[in-house]
UniProtKB/Swiss-Prot annotation:
UniProt KW Disulfide bond keyword: yes
Highest taxon above the source species: Eukaryota
Pfam families: Kazal_1
Stored PROSITE patterns: KAZAL_1 (PS00282), KAZAL_2 (PS51465)
Annotated SMART domains: KAZAL (SM00280)
This protein's record includes keyword Oxidoreductase: no
Protein name as catalogued: Ovomucoid
InterPro entries assigned: Bifunctional_prot_inhibitor, Kazal_dom, Kazal_dom_sf, Prot_inh_Kazal-m
TM regions (residue ranges): none
Single GO MF annotation: serine-type endopeptidase inhibitor activity
Localization, UniProt: Secreted
Main location: secreted
Annotated site (Reactive bond 3): 15-16
Length: 51
């Protein structure tokens, strides 16, 4: 499973809830929050859903 993070980071994210579990074992609330972290901290996707 991969998430396309082209166009990130963004300055603000919506409050949409679509949890994604990152390789840092942190649950990100949605694609925007995950992609911001992926770009800034080189986090990858472990799986869709909470960690």
């Amino acid at each position: 499973v991969s998430i396309d993070c082209s166009g990130y980071p963004k300055p603000a994210c919506t409050l949409e809830f679509f949890p994604l579990c990152g390789s840092d074992n942190q649950t990100y609330s949605n694609k925007c929050a995950f992609c911001n972290a992926a770009v800034e901290k080189n986090v990858t996707l472990n799986h869709i859903g909470e960690c």
